[in-house]
């Protein structure tokens, strides 16, 4: 069974649990190393993400069938059980015998305890027999596999219990792959036809112009339209932020926390590649990532740089028409894409508003009078969003919120701020505020 989809999922889950690895990046690396075809790569991804999306619920059921507390099991054995249980409970197309037998084989290969395979076999076969009689837990934390602290955070923000449950459920769905068309090189219809010819399931976004929804892509790098720089991957929420900012041809734009470069690309395309977009990140390897993306897209207006958003550059003072500050954040709006983020230690999150405020304070000096400062995050926590903006405005009367209108369900935003929700807008969870400098 070397290089199987289930084995790659197991290795990724174990790396997440033991090493703190991010599932998406680690799994892609293992899939490449194993040379999995498109179908097996999709299965490995579904298994890994499915287990992470439902880990607390899977453990709830497994704990009822195991003679030992789950905490006493070898990590690899527990992951084998979770993989098997996920397939039994959620993947109706997988034959139950395959779900059990492949999990047993993985336990036999990776567990230190020679009896582990037999235990995995027994627990999963018991689950097969009893699954229809098992009740769904009432606790939202267990039912939707969100730690209690996170359920409370979202509850404090949303207040409405029905909205809360809808958000938790949306976090466990698979987001579409969203492609933004590089209209400097191709038209949306041309890109759509090229992708269809390569076997990609593609449709136009229902409300966002020059945007396509992709499925069954396999590796994006293999697609000729990707290689030709006809599109880049970016969720609709991030593109909406750039639309609200109002990038226009000839502008001087600073993207202060730019990696992997999506908003810089969106601004450059909106500007017709005329003007300048200074695209910064604190890490040199991310500057290289932005540069590679800009070169693939043929966007010559983008100048990548390594720069800390908190470090002042005097030559940039009042030099930009538009400054975008998509600051480091808790990332709790992109749980659909990073399901393991919910299990990270929440303690470091307390210090984020101070970092965000420091970046916003610094880059605000780069906005020329009459220019725009766009503050953005991919989180849903008020203290990182409106809280940071309110604190900034109290200290900077020369800035004020400016309303905008967006396509789609968000519509008019007269207050100059908007939070996009996965369960309401079918986008990433995202916040942005548009601030205009008067003097």
Predicted segments, located by residue:
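S-adenosylmethionine
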Residues: 1-439
């Amino acid at each position: 069974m070397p290089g199987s989809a289930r084995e790659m999922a197991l290795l990724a889950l174990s790396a997440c649990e033991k090493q703190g690895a991010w599932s998406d990046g680690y799994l892609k690396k293992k899939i490449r190393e194993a040379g999995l075809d498109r179908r097996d790569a999709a299965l490995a991804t579904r298994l890994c993400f499915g287990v992470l999306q439902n880990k607390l619920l899977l453990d709830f059921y497994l704990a009822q069938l195991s003679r030992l507390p789950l905490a006493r099991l070898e990590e690899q054995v527990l992951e084998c059980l979770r993989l098997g249980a996920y397939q039994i409970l959620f993947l109706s197309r997988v034959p139950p015998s395959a779900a059990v037998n492949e999990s047993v084989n993985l336990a036999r290969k990776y567990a230190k305890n020679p009896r582990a395979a037999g235990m995995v076999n027994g627990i999963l076969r018991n689950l097969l027999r009893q699954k229809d009689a098992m009740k769904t837990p009432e606790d939202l934390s267990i039912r939707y596999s969100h730690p209690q602290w996170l359920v409370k955070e979202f509850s404090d923000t949303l207040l409405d219990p029905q909205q809360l449950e809808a958000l938790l459920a949306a976090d466990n769905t698979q987001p579409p792959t969203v492609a933004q068309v590089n209209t400097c090189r191709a038209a949306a219809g041309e890109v759509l036809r090229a992708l269809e010819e390569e076997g990609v399931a593609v449709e136009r976004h229902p409300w966002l112009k020059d945007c396509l929804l992709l499925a069954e892509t396999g590796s994006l790098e293999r697609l000729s339209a990707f290689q030709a720089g006809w599109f880049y991957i970016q969720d609709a929420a991030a593109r909406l932020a750039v639309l609200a900012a109002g990038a226009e041809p000839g502008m001087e734009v600073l993207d202060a926390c730019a990696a992997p470069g999506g908003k810089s690309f969106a601004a450059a395309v909106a500007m017709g590649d005329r003007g300048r977009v200074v695209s910064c990140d604190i890490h040199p390897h991310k500057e290289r990532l932005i540069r590679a993306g800009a070169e693939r897209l043929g966007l010559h207006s983008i100048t990548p740089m390594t720069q800390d958003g908190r470090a002042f550059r005097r030559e940039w003072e009042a030099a930009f028409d538009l400054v975008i500050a998509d600051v480091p954040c808790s990332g709790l709006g992109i749980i659909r894409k990073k399901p393991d983020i919910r299990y990270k230690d929440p303690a470091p999150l307390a210090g984020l508003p101070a970092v965000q405020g420091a970046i916003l304070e610094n880059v605000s000096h780069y906005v020329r009078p009459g220019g725009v400062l766009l503050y953005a995050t991919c989180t849903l926590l008020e203290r990182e969003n409106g809280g940071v903006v309110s604190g900034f405005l109290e200290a900077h009367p020369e800035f004020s919120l400016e309303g905008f209108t967006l396509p789609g369900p968000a519509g008019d935003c007269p207050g100059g701020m908007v939070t996009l929700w996965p369960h309401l807008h079918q986008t990433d969870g995202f916040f942005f505020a548009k601030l205009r400098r008067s003097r």
